[in-house]
């Protein structure tokens, strides 16, 4: 039976489960025996494993996704089927996006681009979707939207599970939110929410409620925003999800800040930080920065400065923190200048004009540009430099208009 394919001793090892044969060896042995369905069954089993792994990744179950990754990697040591390898690489890319391991994702992308011409439409759907997510993680939101839209085109011509449709629409809603395209965000978020509710996916339903709350807040619909956050809060308590509770408390803080209820805003931000004590530095910095701003506008400068210094220390202790979290380095340093008495005025001007404003303009973070241009205008006005003050007040106004007109 094995003549011309493998040695008798190797065949014996296969029969005794001492080695796992390659796909090619299995194919040749099956041909010799006149059996056609063994490879297909193995392929189907592998595809099912990969799709289950992908669903686990999409559900953000990091621990189980890591366990499955190691198990599937061992399986793939002997897999030579082009289709299986393509799906493995695609879902491996999605796994490393979950981990925010951008360096590994970009290395995988090189391999995937080499295989692109062999992809069918389903593979191309995943490819564009994950490429959109990569650009989203890199804060290149226009590029992210472009690739999500390409994925959406492929999605319409194929048959997918409803949860896949909901996930794509949620990602589209997220990127529309980042681009301040509020109607688009509401449309996709509501569609995703309807699917998640029909499938009793509580966590993803809560995420949609949070996103809708952000949209209504931006429209000034405070009561609707509170209703969305309240629904999300109830769900988060039911499923005991501290990560969600941290996000909800943060957004409630932002809402109270909009209403100039500074004490309530600060309490929500503090609760958020308690829930986020085991979260990523990125998640904690978002709330620390909001807390600093709230102390600043409520004129509690001592606590504002204490939080600035604590945040900068966290940055410095983190490996590559100053580059990984450069945006927050800029934010915290701006407030360090504003709150400190012994820093050179020329340093502040140079820092704002050469580093802060260009950075936030480049990444189209118009709210930050408007705020920091106003701070610079106030700085010049206090020093009777009215021409420069007028220039930066106009700049602030223009970027506020950009936010409204997006």
UniProtKB/Swiss-Prot annotation:
It comes from the Bacteria. PROSITE patterns: TPR (PS50005), TPR_REGION (PS50293). Induction: Expressed in the late logarithmic growth phase. Pfam families: HTH_3 (PF01381), RapH_N (PF18801), TPR_12 (PF13424). Keywords: Activator, DNA-binding, Repeat, TPR repeat, Transcription, Transcription regulation. One of its GO terms (molecular function) is DNA binding. TPR repeats lie at residues 125-158, 206-239, 246-279, 285-318. Activates the transcription of nprS by about five fold. May bind to the upstream region of nprS promoter. This is Transcriptional activator NprA.
């Amino acid at each position: 039976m094995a003549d011309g394919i493998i040695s008798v001793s190797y065949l014996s090892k296969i029969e005794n489960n001492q080695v796992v044969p390659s796909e090619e060896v299995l194919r040749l042995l099956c041909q010799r025996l006149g059996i056609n369905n063994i490879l297909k069954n193995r392929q189907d089993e592998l595809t099912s494993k990969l799709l289950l792994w992908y669903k686990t990744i999409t559900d953000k179950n990091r621990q189980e996704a890591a366990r499955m990754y190691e198990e599937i990697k061992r399986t793939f040591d002997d897999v030579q089927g082009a289709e299986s390898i393509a799906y493995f690489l695609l879902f491996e890319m999605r796994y490393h996006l979950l981990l925010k391991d951008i360096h590994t994702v970009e290395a995988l992308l090189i391999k995937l681009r080499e295989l692109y011409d062999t992809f069918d439409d389903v593979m191309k759907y995943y490819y564009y979707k994950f490429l959109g997510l990569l650009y989203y993680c890199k804060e290149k939101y226009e590029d992210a939207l472009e690739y999500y839209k390409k994925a959406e085109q492929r999605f319409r011509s194929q048959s997918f599970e409803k949860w896949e449709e909901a996930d794509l629409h949620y990602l589209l809603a997220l990127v529309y939110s980042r681009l301040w395209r509020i109607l688009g965000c509401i449309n996709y978020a509501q569609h995703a929410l309807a699917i998640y509710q029909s499938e009793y996916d509580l966590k993803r339903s809560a995420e949609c409620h949070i996103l809708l709350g952000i949209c209504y807040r931006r429209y000034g619909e405070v009561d609707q925003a509170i209703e969305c956050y309240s629904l999300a809060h109830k769900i988060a308590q039911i499923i005991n999800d501290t990560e969600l509770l941290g996000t909800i408390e943060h957004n409630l803080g932002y809402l109270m800040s909009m209403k100039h209820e500074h004490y309530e805003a600060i309490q929500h931000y503090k609760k958020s930080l308690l829930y986020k004590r085991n979260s990523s530095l990125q998640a904690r910095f978002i709330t620390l920065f909001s807390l600093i701003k709230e102390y600043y506008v409520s004129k509690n400068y001592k606590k504002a400065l204490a939080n600035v210094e604590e945040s900068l220390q966290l940055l410095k202790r983190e490996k590559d923190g100053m580059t990984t979290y450069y945006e927050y380095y800029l934010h915290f340093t701006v407030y360090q200048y504003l709150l400190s008495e012994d820093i050179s005025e020329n340093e502040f001007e140079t820092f704002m004009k050469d580093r802060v404003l260009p950075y936030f303009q480049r990444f189209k973070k118009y709210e930050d540009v408007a705020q920091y241009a106003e701070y610079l205008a106030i700085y010049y006005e206090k020093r009777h430099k009215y021409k420069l003050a007028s220039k930066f007040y106009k700049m602030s106004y223009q970027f506020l208009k950009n936010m409204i007109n997006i």
